[in-house]
Amino acid sequence: MENIDIRGARTHNLKNINLTIPRNKLVVITGLSGSGKSSLAFDTLYAEGQRRYVESLSAYARQFLSLMEKPDVDSIEGLSPAISIEQKSTSHNPRSTVGTITEIYDYLRLLFARVGEPRCPDHNVPLTAQTISQMVDKVLSLPEDSKMMLLAPVVKNRKGEHVKILENIAAQGYIRARIDGEICDLSDPPKLALQKKHTIEVVVDRFKVRSDLATRLAESFETALELSGGTAIVAEMDNPKAEELVFSANFACPHCGYSVPELEPRLFSFNNPAGACPTCDGLGVQQYFDEDRVVQNPTISLAGGAVKGWDRRNFYYYQMLTSLAKHYHFDVEAPYESLPKKIQHIIMHGSGKEEIEFQYMNDRGDVVIRKHPFEGILNNMARRYKETESMSVREELAKNISNRPCIDCGGSRLRPEARNVYIGRTNLPIIAEKSIGETLEFFTALSLTGQKAQIAEKILKEIRERLQFLVNVGLNYLSLSRSAETLSGGEAQRIRLASQIGAGLVGVMYVLDEPSIGLHQRDNERLLNTLIHLRNLGNTVIVVEHDEDAIRAADHIIDIGPGAGVHGGQVIAQGNADEIMLNPNSITGKFLSGADKIEIPKKRTALDKKKWLKLKGASGNNLKNVNLDIPVGLFTCVTGVSGSGKSTLINDTLFPLAQNALNRAEKTDYAPYQSIEGLEHFDKVIDINQSPIGRTPRSNPATYTGLFTPIRELFAGVPEARARGYNPGRFSFNVRGGRCEACQGDGVLKVEMHFLPDVYVPCDQCKGKRYNRETLEIRYKGKTIHQVLDMTVEEAREFFDAIPMIARKLQTLMDVGLSYIRLGQSSTTLSGGEAQRVKLATELSKRDTGKTLYILDEPTTGLHFADIKQLLEVLHRLRDQGNTIVVIEHNLDVIKTADWIVDLGPEGGSGGGQIIATGTPEQVAKVTSSHTARFLKPILEKP
């Protein structure tokens, strides 16, 4: 079959569509956010492809696999087995890294186990077991007639007089020994000091190097090795300072006897006890109680609560501090930061062995005096954390814990034996820390010889190929040691994509969700080439995408619309880019042809040169002591290639610092910096990201935006409700009273089917309406609470027109383009872009002071050109009210409308971390060293 034929697809908002998709082509599905793209690609095509494959397995095997729900579709023909590559972050397991996900680390373990050279950590000499023949050949290669002696070390750096050993050597017929570097006669050995360490080496043979000595040397080496237990030394007789040759017949260091077991791949695994660092168990980090977190506010006194739980309200611990203050003569009422550093150290870390007189008052008012050392607040917390059985105490103490690199392995996660195995001059931790681009260069240049080259040939081929695939999808800036939980959705998706290319499957249907997220325009071409390569292997590649380059590169485009939600779900246009542009109904076509576009502002908002937010000396991750200046009251875009340090600078440094200072929240961790000034221009900071607005089906836009409370109050105010004594809680489906108890307000019942997918059936008591009959008898303007929750935002806006408090919130949801979502729609069904816009609308509906700092990370994710246009209008409106907007973005339509740009680079990873350009878009476009400028310039010059 040449096509995939879909007949009567009705999943979610799809309107009974019939569609023919060409097989073995690159197909892009595009359309407004919420128009039904994911419903078609993931919930119909992928779900059915996956379901058919799983159903071909035995019932026993099926119970171990998560089955997809059968999509609401009449028929699909021509489907292949389906693989979906989504944006979900890969893993929350701290042991999962880029290297382990891509399986490159497994090949590296094998490589080091087979061709690695173990070394002694103290003497840096290779641990190689040598044969007697190799030892003899080495000695015979020395200059002819060199006067040498062969020594057998019998005592190495051991205390004692060693009388018995010296007598024993002499009894065996040996005449001389080198004791502590001096040649001595064994007939009259020196008396050795009992408490000093000594080294005794027996002189087994003295000789001049000649070619006919081979047999004699072999016998002498045999004697020396037997005497010493496997070690022999060859030294010059006339020059005691000359370098000595040390030989070992064991797999051990000839100097100190350090040895390792036979190298196996598991020795290099931090997930295996054989290879994991014993101190941190292979996690690379250690938890500790952090003084910066414990001292919540150093400007106030200990009595006033500088340390939570140790102030005057907590009598037991406060008594300790007052006794401590009496002993060391400091004032518990003084600001903590004014106390001498020595006193602060004692308070935190304890008094050591020094005993202090503590006065304790018991419940009866009796004073008890006890003398003992003070353990210190940090040690006290660590002990209680370990000993307590109370979860609430443990959770409270955990707020003071931070992570730091393990002191033993330095964050490499491996035990010393594994860290000291080298290929050339490089060990495994060094390779894991390099960027993927640098690692590829290292392995491309690596040349092994002889037997090692033969052993490593296939392993190196696999490593190089996998690294090349990661570089091809624009991930050259990541390192193999990067923890999987720190990856963005786009990065995780591209790693999966690279792994799939490595698998080299043919005849598969790949379904991808916006793989260009987080990618700079510069890297887009490489990503598209990767998708084309997947197609050329003989696969059908279906991509949900809004990126213009991807749409133009597609063999076939499907435009879903015309609107979003209930207004979408139809195929508006399909064909190649030229055919889409000619279709008058296609919104995408209008943007591609230039008939509709996002305009460049006629003039930029004026800069107030006196008002700046200045962050100095930011040095987290790859940032190179960056000084960031953001103009207050403007719309600033932070740009730069993937991995240049944008997220570290804004999300890991600026946002937590501003949050700690302005929002009075729990202290959050921030990356290292020197100083920050200008926060006085703001009264709050808000981070609007794409994380879900709620993780349970009970959470919905009405509850998140605060709409549901006034709606419930309205229903409770209806005369009938007042007559029955119903309060607003009666109209909540989360608490007993008004909800249907058969389904506990869910509206559906879950039926577990074991080796079939779980089935959700409407509750037979409330028929899916979530409330009991009595509650549904209350009507406001003829509608029940269930009917109101089932309204779209647009319908509700009209219905509640006379209630300003509700109408204003609904209007902001419409302003951000969410007129189509239902008030009671489960938040788990919202896309990332929709969740972000619900948050944006919630902020917009609040009374505005004009002094808010808004931070957004790639707000255009999941948004169509038309959605972006609407989003920009909202952001510009916030800016016009005096607020400051900081956006991390790659989308050129957003960048060109910014008032100010901060461009990081020049490259990703270690090649980035610097500010390359700042200024208006027109000023930045002139900077030749900026990759962003190269793509921005032609757009600004377009008529």
Curated annotation (Swiss-Prot):
Coiled coil stretches, renumbered: none
Gene Ontology terms, MF aspect: ATP binding; ATP hydrolysis activity; DNA binding; excinuclease ABC activity; zinc ion binding
UniProtKB keywords: ATP-binding, Cytoplasm, DNA damage, DNA excision, DNA repair, DNA-binding, Excision nuclease, Metal-binding, Nucleotide-binding, Repeat, SOS response, Zinc, Zinc-finger
Cellular component per GO, a single term: excinuclease repair complex
Protein residues bound to ATP: 31-38, 640-647
Pfam family, one: UvrA_DNA-bind
Similarity comment: Belongs to the ABC transporter superfamily. UvrA family.
Protein's job: The UvrABC repair system catalyzes the recognition and processing of DNA lesions. UvrA is an ATPase and a DNA-binding protein. A damage recognition complex composed of 2 UvrA and 2 UvrB subunits scans DNA for abnormalities. When the presence of a lesion has been verified by UvrB, the UvrA molecules dissociate.
Protein name: UvrABC system protein A
Species whose genome carries this gene: Haemophilus influenzae (strain ATCC 51907 / DSM 11121 / KW20 / Rd)
Gene name, Swiss-Prot/TrEMBL: uvrA
